[in-house]
Amino acid sequence: MRWLTVTLVTVILALQWPLWFGKGSWLRVWQLDKQLQEQRATTQKLVARNAALDAEVRDLKQGSDAIEERARNELGMIRNGEVFFQLLDPSKNPSRASHR
């Protein structure tokens, strides 16, 4: 009887081993599922980024307002006859504010 029990336990363990630790085991499935979720999150971020870039490209191709806005904000350009005023916040530049 003892021999039969040992044999059955051994057979059960031999059958369960690939299920838990083999190539297609539950652990591997769990790892792949986690990796898939991370990939989906990354893909979602990239899709949102691509949509924003696509909208910006379409805006630059179709309208001059976007080009003018970028020229003003990024390059500091102004139109003829305009005067540019730059107001500095004294609380953000303590070294200049302390000299007054």
UniProtKB/Swiss-Prot annotation:
Segments on the Cytoplasmic side according to the record's topology features: 1-3
Entries under Pfam families matching the protein: DivIC
Keywords associated with the record: Cell cycle, Cell division, Cell inner membrane, Cell membrane, Coiled coil, Membrane, Transmembrane, Transmembrane helix
Coiled coil feature spans: 49-73
Membrane topology recorded in Swiss-Prot or TrEMBL: Single-pass type II membrane protein
Gene Ontology BP terms: FtsZ-dependent cytokinesis
One Gene Ontology cellular component annotation held by this UniProt entry: cell division site
Transmembrane feature ranges: 4-21
Compartment list: Cell inner membrane
InterPro entries in UniProt: Cell_div_FtsB (IPR023081), FtsL/DivIC (IPR007060)
Primary location group: membrane
Periplasmic-facing ranges: 22-100
Annotated S-S bridges: none
NCBIfam families membership: PRK00888.1
Role: Essential cell division protein. May link together the upstream cell division proteins, which are predominantly cytoplasmic, with the downstream cell division proteins, which are predominantly periplasmic.
HAMAP family named in the record: FtsB
Assembly: Part of a complex composed of FtsB, FtsL and FtsQ.
Family membership: Belongs to the FtsB family.
Name the UniProt record assigns to this protein: Cell division protein FtsB
